Amino acid sequence: MSGVGPLERVRGSFEKQGLMALLGAEVVEARSGLCVIEVPLRDELTQQERYFHGAVTGAIAATAGGYAALTRAPPDREVLTV
């Protein structure tokens, strides 16, 4: 994805992620070394005390970290988290 800015690059990949779509997540900012993802709080994503379930938090943290790395990666590379 040569010639595109960090936000466009991240969103282009992000839109292919089924889990992020299921969560209703959205990339609201991406620049060199940073990616901000927002998820609306819904009952289906909470634990018994109405906070986000840890699995949601972990998935968003892993995804945001991976995309922050992608903003620093060469245009012909992808980044995966495991």
Where are these regions (language model features)?
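Terminal targeting signals and extreme-terminal segments of soluble enzymes
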Residues: 1-82
